[in-house]
Amino acid sequence: MSAPVARLDDVHLSFAGVKAVNGVSFEVNPGELFAIIGPNGAGKTSLFNVLSGVYRPQQGSVRFLGEDILGRRPFRIAAMGMARTFQNIALFEHLTVLDNLMLGRHQHIGYGAAAAFLWRGKARNQELEHRRFVEEIVDFLELEAWRSLPVGLLPYGVQKRVELGRALAMEPKLLLLDEPVAGMNLEETEDTARYILDIRDELDVPIIMVEHDMGLVMDLADRIMVVDFGTPITTGTPAEVQQHPDVIRAYLGEEIGS
């Protein structure tokens, strides 16, 4: 069996004595879509911040691609191949779709400022390669109609798609999706669900997803972990989670049981 892409063991994180993450352990395997669910304030985003190096837990271990990443700075972890989208869109609104996607290539740029200024040799060749790669993302996410427009002029759902594309431009080995369909209408949600599955199945990128849309989670996830006040309740397949009495009572109720 392949080694886990990411693994947390007995992670504890507190702020001023308040437990944000309380004894969480899980692993994400190659090709897997692993979802984390729970109410607001359950510690889901804190777990993403632990994984990506924004927060350092007081206890526990965090491994990515077999390496201990506890204490590494976020840009170092990103350079290893961990990409992330956010609840709130974090794009440069005055830049075009293509320019925003190109920003995701920054860690793959191997030429200096002088070469870039002179636009010759290695800089020119690499720039062309990066643009070809970004154009493939435009095709993959069906962004052709907006490729040259400033992001600030685009509909919300398309902006979320651009943010997803920028994460893909990093060539991630693990993709963290923080509420990828928040605020979307039904059509946008269905489109995003399709792109997420294509990322997992066609690009073979494992995914950790935090999401409040229970229907989406149950349809897409291979496994789900449920947390409450930072404490894990259960981890299992969607079918197993749906049958867990504490999950039904506390979070899902009749939404998935009916």
Task: For each feature predicted by the language model, list its residue ranges.
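Glycine-rich phosphate-binding loops of nucleotide-dependent enzymes
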Residues: 2-258
